[in-house]
């Protein structure tokens, strides 16, 4: 115990001494330390003493070295690490001229790092710019350059005559950026327009946007040049655009003269290489080994290589190099990447990837529900004996790679389609399809040393596409031919070169409907003969072509449940002179089954909308004409209707909404008969619960007549021949008031319907609906001798109403559209109910409430016959069938503003078992 005390004291002294030394090497930077060469009269003296600079506020250094270059970097450390702590503040360097030194900061000792951490803004702008002809970039380190936990980073307009236009280090780290990290318009007279490293770069775990824009290198790596293994991973947004290199790697170059560095790009939520340019190879990336796996949207777009012998429009792999592409959690797309041959008048050729001499693919795979799209071809040089297993998973485990590898000429222009190289992809190694799908579309050719297919995978090919081998056989166990492409009248081609090489096709011959709607195509509206499959070998077709295990009847995938129905038959022919065996397919049409989208009944259901509108107009005129305070005059009212019909297993639901205005007039005769006329203009919208909607305009009119009469049963009995005692006659009422009303209405509707099919072109159709309606009603008003507090008059009512609506025939405008025959709706109903009225003549405010039970005693439901525009196939379409019993509740209120003006409102609700209808009217009347 005694001997331990001195050692404790010694350790404490040493630790305290080290702490004091650390404090001595830390310097605070405050806003007072800022420098502006345009304002400050003195000169800036480079700082070289501290190893750590900690900011206490926002600091800037603007144009130090103006007029006379600085003797060294603004900050320099020659023996230790150099660290800047932002503490949430900003640090800005602008227009620095440090002569032959790095403009902002440098750490010159091997394995000692230059680190910036914790800034709200870190900016290096033109420090130095290209006007400093001896510039050496803005940051330099013999160890690593680390940029950590920075909210916003700007590295722009910097220049170096050496490597790394902005940043040069043994390594580079960018991590923890939460805002925007921008590297733009930096340039190097050698390599690495923005960044150059000898031991690799790591750009990882940035939750903001990392962008490299318009950086230029005079040799390689327009944005980044690395000679060591580099990792770009787990970034939210990584974007390279407009970068350029005079030799290789328009955006990134990752090679070393001696050694095999690897570039690993993985799990970036968005990764885009766009419009980058190189003059030798790799418009976007040139690497010895590249492993690219998607973490989201990944795209190579419009990258270009321009030289006498350009290679790799988007990606170039060095000789004996390796490439792995894996679509893990997002698609990977190569589109419009090109090669331009200088000195040639030919248009640029499409190219996605070039594999250098004796290089190889190690992985080409896509996880389930993801795709690698090659709209530009792949080229390969030399040979490799290693088998490329497309969509290959780990041995002994469930294969997760059941996605799609797609080669397509879909995006080629008409001129580009004339160039065979734009359609041909080549692998100079054996290829095996282990899982998922390999699709060849739009005229492409895929060439490999040999080709084989494992169970559970699908090789899908368009008519006019080719699968060929240069030195091996073709073995296919599950071939699918895209039915949509059969109209080209060109066969799918399988070609095996070499006298002893075979083509073996077994299993199902699938006719694939990729879009799921091909049998809607008019190509199948009649019997057809298609060229299906052509197999070519170099010798002895009878021996080297084996289709003995191929199921002779083609299988539809998926089955054609809707569209044109028919049967497929395949016939084979053999030509020994050309060593070919060819299959033709015969389609025999048997019928047509419309899809649910084509069976949309909205056209028929617009008749129910007209039915609703004309009845609402009649109710408005009836209620408005017979109200307590309604005397002769002119009136105007708004009118709004809403009808909703729920669907069932046989018919889809729909809804109708309309609104507009009504103008009318009322007059009384000397005998107190009432005449009312009205005109309406409505705007309506009908929509089914599917894909169609209709807009319409309705013009309508109505004429209402009401005759009031009082029966006197006692006088009739006294004057009649029947002999009643006076006491018996006195038991009858002295007077019985009656009211008989008659109403006739008409309307015309102009309709314009749009149908937005999920897989067919949009179609439009226009037609008109005509409507005639009428009704007869009988009222028996009673004034209660003991009035209820809520109403004074009770009026039993009974009506007979008829509505007839006709829909004219028409055809939709598109070739995929339909024609509709004439449709009709006829409905005869008998409403029975009563009205309760509160108010007397002379009252300024009155209201009433009515309730009816409505029975539709006769109905002809709307229906029509639909016919395809391009063929005579037709089917019945039946409109909605509203319940035949309804409860109708109506109310109105009237307010006499003065002797010449009256305000009124009407409300109605009709409830049926499968529908509901609401109506609201608000208006005013000028009386005279």
Curated annotation (Swiss-Prot):
GO cellular component: cell outer membrane; extracellular region
Statement: the UniProt record of this protein carries the keyword Membrane: yes
Pfam families found in the cross-reference section: Chlam_PMP, ChlamPMP_M
Coarse class of the protein's main subcellular location: secreted
Domain Autotransporter: 627-928
Location(s) in or outside the cell: Secreted, Cell wall; Cell outer membrane
Domain of life: Bacteria
Keyword Signal (UniProt): yes
Swiss-Prot/TrEMBL keywords: Cell outer membrane, Cell wall, Membrane, Secreted, Signal, Transmembrane, Transmembrane beta strand
SMART domains: Autotransporter
Membrane topology, record value: Peripheral membrane protein
InterPro entries from the UniProt entry: Autotransporte_beta, Autotransporte_beta_dom_sf, Polymorphic_membr_middle, POMP_repeat
Entry-linked PROSITE patterns: AUTOTRANSPORTER (PS51208)
Signal sequence, renumbered to the chain: 1-24
Cysteines joined through disulfide linkages: none
SUPFAM superfamilies referenced in this protein's UniProt entry, alphabetically: Autotransporter
Family per similarity comment: Belongs to the PMP outer membrane protein family.
Protein name stated in the entry: Probable outer membrane protein pmp11
Species: Chlamydia pneumoniae
């Amino acid at each position: 115990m005694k001997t331990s005390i001195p050692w404790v004291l010694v350790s404490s002294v040493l630790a305290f001494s080290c702490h004091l030394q650390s404090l001595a090497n830390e310097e605070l930077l405050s806003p007072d330390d800022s420098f502006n060469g345009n304002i400050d009269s003195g000169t800036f003296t480079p700082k070289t003493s501290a190893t750590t600079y900690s900011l206490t506020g926002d600091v800037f250094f603007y144009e130090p070295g103006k007029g006379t270059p600085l003797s060294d970097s603004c900050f320099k450390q020659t023996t230790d690490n150099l660290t800047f702590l932002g503490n949430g503040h900003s640090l800005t360097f602008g227009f620095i001229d440090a002569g032959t030194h790095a403009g902002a900061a440098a750490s010159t000792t091997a394995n000692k790092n230059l680190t910036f951490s914790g800034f709200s803004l870190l900016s290096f702008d033109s420090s130095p710019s290209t006007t400093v002809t001896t510039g050496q970039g803005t940051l330099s380190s013999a160890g690593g350059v680390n940029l950590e936990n920075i909210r916003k980073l700007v590295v722009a307009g910097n220049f170096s005559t050496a490597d790394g236009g902005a940043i040069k280090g043994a390594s580079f780290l960018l991590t923890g950026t939460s805002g925007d990290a921008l590297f733009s318009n930096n340039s190097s007279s050698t390599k690495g327009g923005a960044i150059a490293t000898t031991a690799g770069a790591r750009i990882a775990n940035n939750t903001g946007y990392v962008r490299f824009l318009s950086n230029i290198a005079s040799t390689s790596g327009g944005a980044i040049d690395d000679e060591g293994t580099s990792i770009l991973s787990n970034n939210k947004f990584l974007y390279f655009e407009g970068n350029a290199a005079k030799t290789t790697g328009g955006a990134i170059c990752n090679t070393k003269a001696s050694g095999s560095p690897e570039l690993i790009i993985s799990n970036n939520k968005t990764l885009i290489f766009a419009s980058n340019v190189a003059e030798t190879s790799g418009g976007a990336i040139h690497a010895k080994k590249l492993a690219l796996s998607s973490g989201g949207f990944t795209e190579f777009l419009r990258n270009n290589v321009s030289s006498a012998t350009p290679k790799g429009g988007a990606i170039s792999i060095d000789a004996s190099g390796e490439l792995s592409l894996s679509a893990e959690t997002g698609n990977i797309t190569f589109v419009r990447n090109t090669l331009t041959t200088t000195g040639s008048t030919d248009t640029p050729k499409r190219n996605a990837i070039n594999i250098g001499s004796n290089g190889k693919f190690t992985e080409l795979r896509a996880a389930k529900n993801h795709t690698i799209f090659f709209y530009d071809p792949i080229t390969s040089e030399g040979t490799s004996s290693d088998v490329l297993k497309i969509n290959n998973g780990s041995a002994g485990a469930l294969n997760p790679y059941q996605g799609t590898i797609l080669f397509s000429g879909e995006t080629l222009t008409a001129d580009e389609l004339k160039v065979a190289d734009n359609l041909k992809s080549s692998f100079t190694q054996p290829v095996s399809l282990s899982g998922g799908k390999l699709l060849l579309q739009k005229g492409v050719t895929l060439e490999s040393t040999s080709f084989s297919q494992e169970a559970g995978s699908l090789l899908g090919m368009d008519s006019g596409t080719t699968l060929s081998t240069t030195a091996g056989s073709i073995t296919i166990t599950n071939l699918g031919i895209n039915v949509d492409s059969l109209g080209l009248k060109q066969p799918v081609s399988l070609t095996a070169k070499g006298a002893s090489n075979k083509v073996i096709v077994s299993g199902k011959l699938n006719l694939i409907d990729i879009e799921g709607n091909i049998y809607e195509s008019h190509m199948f509206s009649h019997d057809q003969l298609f060229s299906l499959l052509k197999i070519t070998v170099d010798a002895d077709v009878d021996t080297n072509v084996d289709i003995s295990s191929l199921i002779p009847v083609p299988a539809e995938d998926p089955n054609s449940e809707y569209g044109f129905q028919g049967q497929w038959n395949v016939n084979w022919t053999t030509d020994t002179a050309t060593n070919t065996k060819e299959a033709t397919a015969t389609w025999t049409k048997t019928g047509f089954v419309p899809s649910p989208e084509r069976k949309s009944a909205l056209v028929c259901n617009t008749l129910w909308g007209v039915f609703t509108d004309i009845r609402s107009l009649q109710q408005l005129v009836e209620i408005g004409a017979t109200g307590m305070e309604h005397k002769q005059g002119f009136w105007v009212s708004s009118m709004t209707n809403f009808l909703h019909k729920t669907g069932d297993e046989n018919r889809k639901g729909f809804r109708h909404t309309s609104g507009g205005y009504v103008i009318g007039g009322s007059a009384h005769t000397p005998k107190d008969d009432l005449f009312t006329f009205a005109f309406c203009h409505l705007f309506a919208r009908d929509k089914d619960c599917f894909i169609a909607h209709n807009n319409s305009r309705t013009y309508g009119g109505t004429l209402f007549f009401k005759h009031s009469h009082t029966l006197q049963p006692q006088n009739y009995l006294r004057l009649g021949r029947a002999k009643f005692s006076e006491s018996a006659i006195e038991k009858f009422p002295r007077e019985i008031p009656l009211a008989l009303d008659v109403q006739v209405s008409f309307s015309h509707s102009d309709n314009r319907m749009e149908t937005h099919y999920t897989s067919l072109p949009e179609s439009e159709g226009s037609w008109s609906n005509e409507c005639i309606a009428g009704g007869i009603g009988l009222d028996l008003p009673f004034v209660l001798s003991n009035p209820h507090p809520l109403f004074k008059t009770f009026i039993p009512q009974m009506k007979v109403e008829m509505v007839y609506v006709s829909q004219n025939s028409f055809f939709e405008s598109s070739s995929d559209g339909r024609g509709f025959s004439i449709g009709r709706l006829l409905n005869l109903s008998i409403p029975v109910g009563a009205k309760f009225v509160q108010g007397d003549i002379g009252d300024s405010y009155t209201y009433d409430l009515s309730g009816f039970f409505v029975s539709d005693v006769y109905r002809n439901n709307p229906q029509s016959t639909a016919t395809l525009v391009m063929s005579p196939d037709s089917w019945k379409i039946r409109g909605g069938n509203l319940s035949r019993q309804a409860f109708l509740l109506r109310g109105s209120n009237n307010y006499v503003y003065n002797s010449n003006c009256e305000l009124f409102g009407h409300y109605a609700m009709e409830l049926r078992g499968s529908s509901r209808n609401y109506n609201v009217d608000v208006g005013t009347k000028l009386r005279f």
